[in-house]
Amino acid sequence: MIVKTDEELQALKEIGYICAKVRDTMKEATKPGVTTRELDHIAKDLFEEHGAISAPIHDENFPGQTCISVNEEVAHGIPGKRVIHEGDLVNIDVSALKNGYYADTGISFVVGKSDQPLKQKVCDVATMAFENAMKKVKPGTKLSNIGKAVHATARQNDLTVIKNLTGHGVGQSLHEAPNHVMNYFDPKDKTLLKEGQVIAVEPFISTHATFVTEGKNEWAFETKDKSYVAQIEHTVIVTKDGPLLTTKIDD
C-alpha cells in the first residue's frame, strides 16, 4: 500500500496503536502459570473494545486471535492449554484490521530469567537487527538493504537469520506487495522503497538454523535442530523523514 491521504495515515496509525496495545498487554501478562489460551483471550477482549478484528481469524481462519509461539515453536503457534514457565522463550505476533486497514507486529522475549543465555541473546540481537534495518528505510533506497542490515547484524553476533520467514507489504490487506522483505541480501532484488509505502519488517534471528519447517500441527513452524529463534516486527511507513512505526507506542 502507498499512503496517499491523511485519512489513510490516521487509519493506519489507529490500527497500529491497537495492535501495539494488544501486544504489550499480552507481554505484560505472560507470567509463569498462565496458559497461551488465557493470553489470547486478552487479545479478544481488547480487539472487541477497540472495534478491531483479528487478521489471522479474518484472513486465514486461524484457530486463535493471535499467534503465540513458545520455545521450539518459531512462528504461528496456536494458543491453547500450553502453560508458560519461567525461562520460556515466547513470541507474540499480533495482526488485526479496522475499517479496512491492517497492522502487523510481534515481539520475542524471555519469561523471567533463564539459565540459557542464548535465549536472551537472540532477542537482543533481533532488536538490534531491526534498529539497524530502520536506518536503511527511506524513499528511493533499495528494499534489499533491509535484509543486508539484518543479516550483517546476525553475523556480527555469531548468529543466523531464518531465510524462509520474511516481512511483507501490508496496509489494505495483511500480505501485499512487496511479497517479501528478506532478512538477508538478495542482489537480484532491485525494488526501490517509495514514499508512503507500508511494509512489515520482521527479523528472525537464530542461534544456528537458517530455515524453518512444519512443526507439530498444520500451522506452527519449528527448526529441525531446535535452535532458539527470536523475532521483532513492526508495521513501517516509508517517509522522507525516515521510518514511521505505526505499531510502536512512544514512551
Swiss-Prot record:
Keyword entries, A-Z: Aminopeptidase, Hydrolase, Metal-binding, Protease
Keyword Ubl conjugation: no
One biological process term in Gene Ontology: proteolysis
One Pfam assignment: Peptidase_M24
Reactions listed under catalytic activity: Release of N-terminal amino acids, preferentially methionine, from peptides and arylamides
UniProt binding sites for a divalent metal cation 1: 93, 104, 233
InterPro entries: Creatinase/aminopeptidase-like, Pept_M24, Pept_M24_MAP, Pept_M24A_MAP1
Subunit structure: Monomer.
Protein name: Methionine aminopeptidase
Similarity annotation: Belongs to the peptidase M24A family. Methionine aminopeptidase type 1 subfamily.
Domain of life, source organism: Bacteria
Cofactor(s), by name: Co(2+); Zn(2+); Mn(2+); Fe(2+)
Positions annotated to bind substrate: 76, 175
Gene symbol of the encoding locus: map
SUPFAM superfamilies: Creatinase/aminopeptidase
Cofactor note: Binds 2 divalent metal cations per subunit. Has a high-affinity and a low affinity metal-binding site. The true nature of the physiological cofactor is under debate. The enzyme is active with cobalt, zinc, manganese or divalent iron ions. Most likely, methionine aminopeptidases function as mononuclear Fe(2+)-metalloproteases under physiological conditions, and the catalytically relevant metal-binding site has been assigned to the histidine-containing high-affinity site.
Record-annotated membrane-spanning stretches: none
Gene Ontology molecular function: initiator methionyl aminopeptidase activity; metal ion binding; metalloaminopeptidase activity
Binding site for a divalent metal cation 2: 104, 168, 202, 233
Disulfide bridges in this chain: none
UniProt-listed Enzyme Commission number(s): 3.4.11.18
The protein's role, per its UniProt record: Removes the N-terminal methionine from nascent proteins. The N-terminal methionine is often cleaved when the second residue in the primary sequence is small and uncharged (Met-Ala-, Cys, Gly, Pro, Ser, Thr, or Val). Requires deformylation of the N(alpha)-formylated initiator methionine before it can be hydrolyzed.
Gene3D superfamilies to which the protein is assigned, alphabetical: Creatinase/methionine aminopeptidase superfamily (3.90.230.10)
